[in-house]
Amino acid sequence: MKSDKSNLEVRALAKHIRMSAHKARRVVNQIRGRSYEQALMILEFMPYRACYPILQLVSSAAANANHNLNLNRANLIISEAKVDEGPVLKRFQPRAQGRGYPIHKPTCHITITVKNKN
């Protein structure tokens, strides 16, 4: 969070989301640079599973901006949105004749930063 009054930024971070970073980036790329209301509309009507945690995160970032810095939600834009890869959960799938195939369950970390339009 920056202390400059003209360029206040608020960040919300979700870690260890059980989803591939590639699939989450597909959604995050659509809302980067958009206004708060526009991002909510886009996320609500996109048919991807990644939309729900990202929608919660955008709402959390706006709530943080409203509560901590008294910024109006109508004046917020999503200045930065990024998805980083998290740790991979490694499991084994039993197969025929005593074999086991590895299963990789990826996770990701999603960061949303909002700032005032002005």
Curated annotation (Swiss-Prot):
Write the record's keywords in alphabetical order, separated by commas.
Chloroplast, Plastid, Ribonucleoprotein, Ribosomal protein, RNA-binding, rRNA-binding
- SUPFAM superfamilies given in the database record: Ribosomal protein L22
Cite a GO CC annotation. Answer: chloroplast
Q: Does the record bear Membrane in its keywords?
A: no
What are this entry's molecular-function GO terms?
Answer: rRNA binding; structural constituent of ribosome
Which GO terms of type biological process are on file? translation
Mind telling me which InterPro entries this protein's record contains?
A: Ribosomal_uL22, Ribosomal_uL22_bac/chlpt-type, Ribosomal_uL22_bac/org-type, Ribosomal_uL22_CS, Ribosomal_uL22_sf
* Principal place of residence: plastid
Q: Where is the signal peptide?
A: none
Give compartment(s): Plastid, Chloroplast
Q: What does this protein do?
A: This protein binds specifically to 23S rRNA.
- Protein family according to the UniProt entry: Belongs to the universal ribosomal protein uL22 family.
Assembly and binders? Part of the 50S ribosomal subunit.
Instruction: Give the matching PANTHER family.
Output: CHLOROPLAST 50S RIBOSOMAL PROTEIN L22-RELATED, LARGE RIBOSOMAL SUBUNIT PROTEIN UL22M
Protein name, UniProt field: Large ribosomal subunit protein uL22c
